[in-house]
Amino acid sequence: MASTPRIVIIGAGIVGTNLADELVTRGWNNITVLDQGPLNMPGGSTSHAPGLVFQTNPSKTMASFAKYTVEKLLSLTEDGVSCFNQVGGLEVATTETRLADLKRKLGYAAAWGIEGRLLSPAECQELYPLLDGENILGGLHVPSDGLASAARAVQLLIKRTESAGVTYRGSTTVTGIEQSGGRVTGVQTADGVIPADIVVSCAGFWGAKIGAMIGMAVPLLPLAHQYVKTTPVPAQQGRNDQPNGARLPILRHQDQDLYYREHGDRYGIGSYAHRPMPVDVDTLGAYAPETVSEHHMPSRLDFTLEDFLPAWEATKQLLPALADSEIEDGFNGIFSFTPDGGPLLGESKELDGFYVAEAVWVTHSAGVAKAMAELLTTGRSETDLGECDITRFEDVQLTPEYVSETSQQNFVEIYDVLHPLQPRLSPRNLRVSPFHARHKELGAFFLEAGGWERPYWFEANAALLKEMPAEWLPPARDAWSGMFSSPIAAAEAWKTRTAVAMYDMTPLKRLEVSGPGALKLLQELTTADLAKKPGAVTYTLLLDHAGGVRSDITVARLSEDTFQLGANGNIDTAYFERAARHQTQSGSATDWVQVRDTTGGTCCIGLWGPLARDLVSKVSDDDFTNDGLKYFRAKNVVIGGIPVTAMRLSYVGELGWELYTSADNGQRLWDALWQAGQPFGVIAAGRAAFSSLRLEKGYRSWGTDMTTEHDPFEAGLGFAVKMAKESFIGKGALEGRTEEASARRLRCLTIDDGRSIVLGKEPVFYKEQAVGYVTSAAYGYTVAKPIAYSYLPGTVSVGDSVDIEYFGRRITATVTEDPLYDPKMTRLRG
């Protein structure tokens, strides 16, 4: 067998052992798995996990992980018994809000290919006789959910992979990570150094300690979560012949933050209905492997009965039969939580070859392991990992204070019904643009992303609702789609289309790539030919080696060796920094290149609208005519005495520019434009109007409209790919592909009734079959109809009808050519 890289996996829990198995399946054979605990019971979260697997999730990625986990554990058998008991899952509603949310969740299930159905109260009780039918309003049943035997699965995976040559070393504590030349070289243990080409930390709630060994911030917080077992329940006698047997579905009562499973004739109850209990792993004491047992392990803390008593009372109301039993034993078990609730996956930006797979629960374990194995062996995962990427957080989101507060908030809200736009109440105002004071004066309604305060609309524009033509007034929204929205956005869209508006674009990531090797780097990473004269601005894509879209960016060549990039967050930053480091280290002096994140030190105003040129001419002597600054060109100008880089581009589809200056000059630039714009009716406009105008123009948004799971032709972005270019990452994979030949294509949908507004991720049906899901959606104020985008089979044509399911209601939509607004680009080039 050919030699493969030396892999060291830290952690022999459900993720680490699954990863070893997935790597073996792909032909990698030089693998060592370490754990500080005994292999038969490592003592991490896996060892006490109750094993409930509910697959349905708002995230396509997380649902994909869960589906594969079920599939794999079902196939992992010994003596004819698998590691997954597919009893099904039942989620019940005791409030109208929860019942509506179950309808939405059923939509997610349909979108992600998971079978489920809504049950009436009577059907819930028939399926689960112990339920108190009087308080149940309905339920969601997913037959393929069930119970994972996580600890047993770990032992079978160890047995299987050991026979394939994997080395396991239990009771082995990691004391450090060896490195040389910016790359991992080994793992230090008390017994010596284990050489390694790749190290993967699957250390669970110890993950932050392992990361700290290389100076890496791993943003997870260990939190204790309560779990109890009851004494025998009389109504359960004779139902299960195994001590941990179960025949009833796993049960979730999210209105009270509770879940349930059978343990033979006893019940297991998990509760999030208590105060957050953060755990400092340094207080757990020295690890003593010889003392680990089922009831004594580092991840299992003493039970605090007083925290559980309200949950016990709620349990007896939901399941009256449990009133005849008592709490027999319980514990506070440690799990990992993160600032946004997602797992932490991928390669460290600090050290090449050091990977993490942390904050992963049993539900997603095998799916995550598969994705990580694909990433290691091929350089990409078949499942898009953007929302799980360890590099996704901004620096301000990696501080211990931020990680602690937000992770505890996620614990409190874990079962809450949260709107997609639901803002955090705290921490806020972490990052504000230089225009923030002016935004507040204008009554901005702020939402937060990446730590940035982003205005969505301005109350100062409310009076415009009485001035604008009646056809611009949007229809009344239902309660859900109406949350965190305002009709004022329509007025802001109207002013953008008919006069001029100022948009704060500061939070969008800006990178400077410079040095003699800058062009070489960008040519290899992007799909466009960037060998253009200074002043050129280019829209282009970053692809992975299989042709998946890993990002879309704009590149402005400011000089021979300096480029400004408009990127998509810290994932792009880490990608460019790593590529620049590799090129600089491996090349000659002429290959030297550096990447700087300039976002915090700069700011940007999008000045857009048919009167934008009239406005800017009042405060600048520079030539902003079509000849003076052509479409997709940049130049240095002076506006109101302030040095500015102006780029002629617009993501709202109107004449205008992105105007960049240093942060210290930002408020002066805003004030100069604002004052000069008063005769032209200038307004400040927010992200709500921006999103609507973007969709009317057919512009894609990375992370929703396209990911690594889509190629440029499927996404309708073939124009951004220059196949005549000598080389770029992903080029080989795109050979022979065309938009017309794509098996699926991103399509524009317009809602037939003109008033039903969806938000995203709703399933799309064609001829009664779920064939896609909504990627982006908004009300189109200019076109006076709701808009949605969805990937649909290539056989679906313009003019065909589809149905979008929204809270259980089917909404008819028509496949429409895009863009809906200004397809000939006359407004942009005006």
Swiss-Prot record:
Q: Which cofactor does it need?
A: FAD
Q: Which UniProt keywords apply?
A: FAD, Flavoprotein, Nucleotide-binding, Oxidoreductase
- EC number(s) on file: 1.5.3.10
For (6S)-5,6,7,8-tetrahydrofolate, which residues are the binding ones? 539, 554, 566, 658-660
Active-site residue numbers: 225, 259, 552
Fetch the Gene3D superfamilies from UniProt: Aminomethyltransferase beta-barrel domains, D-Amino Acid Oxidase, subunit A, domain 2, FAD/NAD(P)-binding domain, Probable tRNA modification gtpase trme, domain 1
Known InterPro entries for this protein?
A: FAD-dep_OxRdtase (IPR006076), FAD/NAD-bd_sf (IPR036188), FAO_M (IPR032503), GCST_C (IPR013977), GCV_T_N (IPR006222), GcvT/YgfZ/DmdA (IPR028896), GcvT/YgfZ_C (IPR029043), TrmE/GcvT_dom1 (IPR027266)
Q: Which reaction does it catalyse?
A: N,N-dimethylglycine + O2 + H2O = sarcosine + formaldehyde + H2O2; N,N-dimethylglycine + (6S)-5,6,7,8-tetrahydrofolate + O2 = sarcosine + (6R)-5,10-methylene-5,6,7,8-tetrahydrofolate + H2O2
* SUPFAM superfamilies referenced in this protein's UniProt entry, alphabetically: Aminomethyltransferase beta-barrel domain (SSF101790), FAD-linked reductases, C-terminal domain (SSF54373), FAD/NAD(P)-binding domain (SSF51905), Folate-binding domain (SSF103025)
Q: Which family does it belong to?
A: Belongs to the GcvT family.
- PANTHER family assigned: AMINOMETHYLTRANSFERASE, SARCOSINE DEHYDROGENASE
As for what it does, the entry says: Catalyzes the oxidative demethylation of N,N-dimethylglycine to yield sarcosine, formaldehyde and hydrogen peroxide. The oxidation of dimethylglycine is coupled to the synthesis of 5,10-methylenetetrahydrofolate through an unusual substrate channeling mechanism. This channeling occurs by nonbiased diffusion of the iminium intermediate through a large solvent cavity connecting active site 1 (N-terminus) and active site 2 (C-terminus).
Q: What is this protein called?
A: Dimethylglycine oxidase
Q: Which organism is it from?
A: Arthrobacter globiformis
Show the taxonomic lineage.
Bacteria, Bacillati, Actinomycetota, Actinomycetes, Micrococcales
